[in-house]
Amino acid sequence: MASLINQAAWQPKARTRSLQVGPGPTPSPNEHEIVIKVAYAAVNPTDWKMQDTPYFELEYPFIWGTDVAGTIVQLGSEVTQFKVGQRVIGHCDSLLTRKVTNAGFQLYTTVREILVAEIPDSLPLANAAVLPLSVSTAASALYVQLDLPFPSLSPKSTGKRIVIWGGSSSVGSSAIQLAVASGLEVVATASQANHDLVRSLGASQVFDHRAPSVIDQMASVLQPGDYVVDCIGSPDTQAKCGELVGRIGGGTLPVMLWPQGGLPQNVRAVFVNGLDPGMVNLDVGNAVWRKFIPEALAAGKFQAKPDPRIVPGGLEKVQEGIDMLRQGVSAQKIVIEISRSE
C-alpha cells in the first residue's frame, strides 16, 4: 500500500508543557502489529506525569498517548483475527517499547495485536477511546495479581466480594464490570454524586469515600478472603485500602502507586502494571482483549465509562487536554478528537 503520511504531537524535550505538532513516524508494523488511523485518543494521568517528572529516561523528541480508537488501515503479516476497515480500540505501549511508532497522539499508530479489540457500530469511537488502558490495568489487578476467574458473559458466583476503591474512575469503571463478569459481588467507593453511575456499572453497594467511618462501614460487609483493589493510586487511598485489607484478615492489595510502606504486616501491596496482559501474562490478554471485551461490547454487557469529555481540534489540542486532566476531572475522561472518522 502507499506510504501513510503521518502527523504527531511531539514532546520536544523533558519537563516542558508544550507539545509540537509535526510530521510523525512512518508506520511499519511487524508481523503481529496493527496500524490504526486514530480518530480519538484519550488522555491519562501518565501523560501529564511523564511530561512533568518522567519516571525514567527517554530519548526526545517523544510521543505520549496510550488509549486510541479508530479504524484499521494495515495489518502485520501474521495477523488473522482482524481486517482492514474494522473499527477498533487499541492500547498503545510506547512507554514500554520506547518506540514512537507505538504512541497514541498521532494520526497513525502501530499497536500489538493482542491489545486491539473490535468494537460494535453502535459504540461511538469517542466513547470507546476511554477503555484501553483502564481495561488492561483492571485486568492486570484482577487476573494477574488476584488470580480471579476470567470474565464471562454468563459468570458463576464465586461467593466473594471485592472492594473497588474509586469506582467512578476510569480504571474503577472497568474493574467493577470485569469483577461482576468474573462472578464477584462488588462493593465500591465514590463521591455521593457518582453513586448512581457506579451502581449502573454493577456495584451492589456504594460508600462515600469521604465519610469518616467509611473503613468501618466497608469492613462490616466483608469477610476474610474477600478482596480490595485501590484504583485511585494515592498515598491516602493506599493507606486506607491497606487498613481495610488488614481488618479482614490480610492478603494481596493491588495498587496503582508504587507500594508506600507502613501497611499492616498481613497486607502485601503489589503494583499493577497495565501492560502486563499484553506482554507477560498473555493468557489474560487473550481472555480479556481477544474474547471478553469484543463479545461484551457487542452484547451490550460492558459500558464504555466514564463518559468522554471531547476536546475537538486535532493534534494541536493534545496539550490542552493534558493540562485539563492535570487540573483534575471527576467521572469523565478527556478525549482528543485526532481526526474525523465518523
From Swiss-Prot:
Pfam families in the cross-refs: ADH_N (PF08240), ADH_zinc_N (PF00107)
Pathway note: Secondary metabolite biosynthesis
Enzyme Commission identifier(s): 1.-.-.-
Keyword hit for Oxidoreductase: yes
Matching InterPro entries: ADH-like_C, ADH-like_N, GroES-like_sf, NAD(P)-bd_dom_sf, PKS_ER, Trans-enoyl_RdTase-like
Binding of NADP(+), residues: 46-49, 168-171, 191-194, 255-256, 329-330
Highest taxon listed in the record's lineage: Eukaryota
Keywords, comma-separated and alphabetical: NADP, Nucleotide-binding, Oxidoreductase
Binding site for substrate: 133-140
Quaternary structure annotation from Swiss-Prot or TrEMBL: Monomer.
Function text: Trans-enoyl reductase; part of the him gene cluster that mediates the biosynthesis of himeic acid A, a ubiquitin-activating enzyme (E1) inhibitor. First, himA, together with the trans-enoyl reductase himH, catalyzes the formation of apolyketide chain, which is then condensed with leucine by the NRPS activity of himA. Dieckmann cyclization and release from himA gives a tetramic acid intermediate as the product of himA PKS-NRPS. HimG then catalyzes alpha-oxidation of the tetramic acid ring, with a subsequent rearrangement to yield apyrone intermediate.
This protein's name: Trans-enoyl reductase himH
Source organism phylogeny: Eukaryota, Fungi, Dikarya, Ascomycota, Pezizomycotina
